[in-house]
Structures are given as C-alpha cells and as structure tokens.
Amino acid sequence: MSSIDKKELAKFEKISHNWWNKDGEFGLLHRINPIRLEYIIEKITAHYNRHLSKLEILDVGCGGGLIAMPLAAQGFNVTAIDALQSNIETASTYAKENNVKINYLQSTIEELESDKLYDVVICIEVIEHVGNVQQFILNLVKHIKPNGMAIISTINRTKKAYALGIIVAEYILGWVPKNTHDYTKFLKPSEIYEMLTDTDIEIKELKGLVYDPAKNEWKLSDDIDVNYFMCLGSKNAKSINVIPALAGMTS
C-alpha cells in the first residue's frame, strides 16, 4: 500500500517549477530555512560529534531541494527522494547549476531499496501531506542505521495551529497558497509516539518553531502548539533532551 495522497501531489505538481523563487509560493519556506538548517545541523553534530562529510543522509519528500542542497554543500553525502518527478527535475537542475552533488531519486519511501540504511533520515514538512501516515512513518524509521537518528517536522493538530497555520498563513497574510494544508492531516506528537510503540525507535526531543511578529523573525521555542521538530533515535541510545519530549506527549 502506498502512502501517496494523489490530491496532495497534484497541488505541488502545479507549482513544482517554482521551488527556488523566494517571492513565490514557497517564499515562507525560504524564510524559515535558515533556522530549520541550524537546528538540523546542530542536532546531527551533537549526535555524532564527528566529521560530517562521512555521514549519509536521506531526505524524504525533498521537494525542490531546499534542505538537501545546503546540507550537501556542508559536506554531507545526501540522497534525496520525492514522489514527484517534476520536483526531482527542478531540484536536480538547481543542484547542477550550482555544482552541488546530490543523489536525487524519484521514489516514494515504500519504493526505496529496503536494506539501504542511513546515518540520518530527514523528513521536513512532509507527513502532513501523505496518505497513510502510520505506514509512512514506519517505513521512514526502517531506514535509520543502528544508533542513527531521524529529524522530522510537521504541524500540531490544535486550535492554535488551525488559526495560525491555516486562517492567518493562508487566508489573511497569504504566506502560502490557500488550501495548502488540511487541518485533519495535522499530527499531535502523541500520535507519532503511539505509531512508534512497536519499533525500537523513540522520540528524543521536541522543539517548536514560532514566529515573533515584533522582530519579524522565526525562532526555536518550547512552544510546540503549531510547528514542531521531532528528533528520533534508538530506545537504547541516550536522549538528546528527554524532558521536552516527555512533556510533549500530552499534546
């Protein structure tokens, strides 16, 4: 069974040529990308504490390569997959134009070579757009090496997330196109926790991403009511920051 949601794919296929237009439909992602990358690199460095160029990263649902490109430029060995061929074409063209080496593949997580494991699996702003979420997440964590890690981000299913993530972001401020998000697809951290119960993977850290209107900037926060990052790792490995993770299980 595939985790693809054809309606979601159709939405992104229409704008797949525009990933690198900072003033286009993906403008918000460009604005939050620096803080996203800062968090990702910080967590990978803390987890491995060794030279980054030797690490293999899988970027699932890579889109136009907004995360894959700068990670590869940092020295990571990046494989990036996306279900949309048009996304892969846009990403590959941009990487070639900028002389950045990335292994781009048009593939779903289910179609990916099953025995290929990675030091880090990344899935940023994707799971709120897939069909069978539990299947998707279980397939995702299967590709983590022993003692490896995963970093995912998504949107919490709260009234605050509906107000800010849909009403304000889509209909008032126009930060993203209308109908980009479906509130019913938002996920509480506790739901992901339950999905991982029968695996050897657990949540190691939760961290929120919030907008500060006074400073007109995005920043990391312990507020996970809307956007949040989640670090995953082996249940036998030391937690990165277990207190926020445990606190988040009530959300």
Swiss-Prot record:
Entry-linked Pfam families: Methyltransf_23 (PF13489)
Keyword Secreted on entry: no
Residue numbers binding S-adenosyl-L-methionine: 36, 61, 82, 124
Any one Gene Ontology BP term: methylation
Catalytic activity: a 3-demethylubiquinol + S-adenosyl-L-methionine = a ubiquinol + S-adenosyl-L-homocysteine + H(+); a 3-(all-trans-polyprenyl)benzene-1,2-diol + S-adenosyl-L-methionine = a 2-methoxy-6-(all-trans-polyprenyl)phenol + S-adenosyl-L-homocysteine + H(+)
EC number: 2.1.1.222, 2.1.1.64
GO function terms (MF aspect): 2-polyprenyl-6-hydroxyphenol methylase activity; 3-demethylubiquinol 3-O-methyltransferase activity; polyprenyldihydroxybenzoate methyltransferase activity
UniProt xrefs under InterPro entries: SAM-dependent_MTases_sf, UbiG_MeTrfase
Keywords associated with the record: Methyltransferase, S-adenosyl-L-methionine, Transferase, Ubiquinone biosynthesis
Pathway(s) annotated for this protein in UniProt: Cofactor biosynthesis; ubiquinone biosynthesis
Gene3D superfamilies for the chain: Vaccinia Virus protein VP39 (3.40.50.150)
Origin superkingdom: Bacteria
Keyword Endoplasmic reticulum included in the entry's annotation: no
Enzyme class: transferase
NCBIfam families with a match to the protein in the record: UbiG (TIGR01983)
Family statement: Belongs to the methyltransferase superfamily. UbiG/COQ3 family.
Record function comment: O-methyltransferase that catalyzes the 2 O-methylation steps in the ubiquinone biosynthetic pathway.
The protein, known as: Ubiquinone biosynthesis O-methyltransferase
Originating species: Rickettsia akari (strain Hartford)
